[in-house]
């Protein structure tokens, strides 16, 4: 078989799983946003692996699902709302892991509400049939 025939045969096989992963991860992001907007921090935490690590902008590393739930509940939820996540790229790291790069915007709460925007990187792990955040890092700015 020629090289071109091999490329034609295998490229669709590679694109299919990647686009499926992206769609599943975008659905998980939508669920995260839904939980956030409802103030359901336990629901948000359920989207992380048990041993997940969050690396918030300008703050100490947070490790473990319970600590991540407390982080969202105690620190950020009081100060920001209306999160919007935009997935820019999802790169499969095998059948049960993926790296996502995206941007976010939030609105600060209070009398002088401002929009804050930034970027993030998430490493996702497939746990059973669900994608879960294993590593979550973000910072503000473009």
Segments (PLM) and residue ranges:
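A solvent-exposed, acidic/Ser-Thr-rich amphipathic alpha-helical stretch
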Residues: 22-28, 40-96, 105, 109, ...
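A short, structured loop/turn motif at beta-sheet edges
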Residues: 90-98, 125-130
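Amphipathic alpha-helical repeat scaffolds
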Residues: 30-33
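Bacterial N-terminal signal peptides
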Residues: 5-14
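Short beta-strand edge/turn micro-motifs at domain boundaries
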Residues: 117-141
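Sec/Tat signal peptide C-region and signal peptidase I cleavage site
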Residues: 16-20
